[in-house]
Amino acid sequence: MAGSNCGCGSSCKCGDSCSCEKNYNKECDNCSCGSNCSCGSSCNC
């Protein structure tokens, strides 16, 4: 478990790796603080 608030389309914390829900095997790595990350999208802090 990378983070509690890490879900597909949910807000991810900086440096947290978020696993996409649904039927996607992609992850959201290095999400920006307070930003929303889409499935398979990589955001920089």
From Swiss-Prot:
UniProt-recorded Gene Ontology molecular function terms: copper ion binding
UniProt GO BP: response to copper ion
UniProt KW Metal-binding keyword: yes
Cellular component terms (Gene Ontology): cytosolic ribosome
Organs and tissues of expression: Widely expressed at low levels.
Keywords assigned by UniProt, alphabetized: Metal-binding, Metal-thiolate cluster
Biological role: Metallothioneins have a high content of cysteine residues that bind various heavy metals. Confers tolerance to cadmium (Cd) and plays a role in Cd and zinc (Zn) homeostasis.
Stated family: Belongs to the metallothionein superfamily. Type 15 family.
Protein known as: Metallothionein-like protein 1C
